[in-house]
């Protein structure tokens, strides 16, 4: 029973997230030989002010959107 977690900044549309979930689920089914019903996808979204790379907050590097 695979559990796949995506961590990303907020701002993607519901349609983008649905497309991601569909594609990653299909990939898990094909490569791991599991039933679709066994695949769980969790999307954790973060405010850009709570995420940093290279020592810089993403809200500064990329803006608040």
Mark where each language-model region is.
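A domain-level signal for the structural core that forms small-molecule/cofactor-binding pockets
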Residues: 2-65
